[in-house]
């Protein structure tokens, strides 16, 4: 079956991805199952880790040579994810959720306020840093050491113009509040739209082709036309797919 852009597909991603042409996707953004929820919980049957070898075979086939693969993770799953493809792993972003989870264990361990976003690619992808406004006291400016063109970390390097700006480059820690469960919160592990919008703006060009899925049996393919084109992906069950379709219709 051919997978078309701007559609939600309910099914196993490993069955659906063969319908995507080779080297046709600019970005893959995925919230994989972490395999951390109680297996006896009948509402968490979707939280089963997808076989990495099979998953990477499809990812590496459909991604463009300079495309990017962004995969959410946490704890030991992040470690396993990084180890699953050491050749393509580059770095991690830290998503600060602004709200802790794990309150039942708060007297035993710190509550968790962040998740990882593992960044993989074959060749250097598009990178549009989303600049951060800065106050006059913390403006991006030179340190008066333009004559020093070597250091212990980078060795010798070329000088660059010294520019005083009202914004600075982003760091690896990005803050987007997760929010609270509301009628618009369609799944307990869904990610904020603004976070996904940030990732799409950072790693794709206008008109880029991205795919996004969440869990083993969810699939979404879309095209980045600008601010309006950000999708919330469907979940395994039919009720979540219907919810996503209703959300997109507005």
PLM features per residue range, with description:
Residues 1-231, 238-241:
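Core catalytic lobe of class I
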Residues 242, 246:
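Short functional hotspots where side chains directly engage DNA or cofactors
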Residues 249:
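Catalytic-site neighborhood detector that most strongly recognizes the C-terminal catalytic loop/helix
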């Amino acid at each position: 079956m051919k997978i078309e852009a701007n559609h939600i597909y309910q099914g196993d991603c490993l069955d659906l991805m063969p319908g995507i042409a080779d080297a046709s996707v600019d970005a893959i953004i995925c919230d994989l199952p972490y395999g951390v929820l109680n297996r006896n919980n009948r509402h968490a049957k979707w939280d089963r880790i997808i076989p990495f070898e099979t998953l990477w075979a499809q990812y590496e086939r459909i991604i463009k040579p300079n495309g990017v693969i962004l995969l959410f993770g946490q704890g030991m799953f992040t470690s396993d994810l990084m180890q699953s493809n050491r050749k393509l792993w580059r770095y991690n972003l830290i998503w600060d959720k602004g709200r802790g989870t794990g309150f039942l264990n708060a007297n035993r361990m710190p509550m968790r306020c962040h998740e990882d976003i593992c960044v993989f690619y074959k060749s250097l992808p598009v990178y549009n840093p989303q600049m951060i406004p800065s106050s006059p006291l913390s403006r991006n400016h030179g340190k008066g050491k333009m004559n020093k063109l070597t250091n212990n970390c980078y060795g010798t390097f070329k000088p660059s113009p010294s520019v005083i700006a009202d914004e600075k480059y982003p760091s690896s820690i990005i803050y987007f509040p997760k929010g609270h469960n509301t009628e618009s919160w369609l799944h307990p592990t869904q990610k904020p739209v603004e976070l996904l919008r940030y990732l799409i703006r950072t790693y794709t060009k206008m008109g880029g082709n991205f795919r996004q899925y969440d869990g083993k049996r969810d699939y979404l393919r879309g095209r980045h036309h600008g601010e309006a084109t950000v999708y919330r992906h469907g979940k395994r069950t039919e009720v979540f797919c219907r919810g996503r379709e209703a959300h997109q219709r507005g």
